[in-house]
């Protein structure tokens, strides 16, 4: 709502229900609003629902935080491959996902040249 209260959309049951509706190789993406209180608890619930296969990207310019969670086989992709795909999308559609790729790279903190979930 206007006061960033998400109610039942931020419960363990909600995240478990989202997971149950994904395919065997599903990816769940959510947006945590910039005034979201209790972000750590929300991420913990999402991580629990997805068997410790969840993460949050560093905040974007608006302050919003994107949460990702996965089911099925591990997600493991080179950051260069993500960047190449983002460049193709920008060229072909105008959709600029390069800032998202940069946030994913920051999430790795230079420890790896791959994104794994």
Report the location of each language-model feature.
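SAM/dcSAM-binding transferase cores
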Residues: 65-117
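Ordered hydrophobic segments in well-structured contexts
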Residues: 27, 55, 66-70
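Conserved beta-strand signature within the Rossmann-like core of class I S-adenosyl-L-methionine
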Residues: 25-32
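Short, well-ordered secondary-structure micro-motifs
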Residues: 5-7, 40-41, 67
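A short glycine-rich, Lys/Arg-flanked "PGG" loop and its adjoining helix->strand segment in the class I
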Residues: 10-24
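Conserved Class I S-adenosyl-L-methionine
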Residues: 14-16, 40-61
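A short SAM/SAH-binding and catalytic strip from SAM-dependent methyltransferases
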Residues: 1-9, 32-33
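Conserved PLP phosphate-binding loop immediately N-terminal to the Schiff-base lysine helix
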Residues: 37
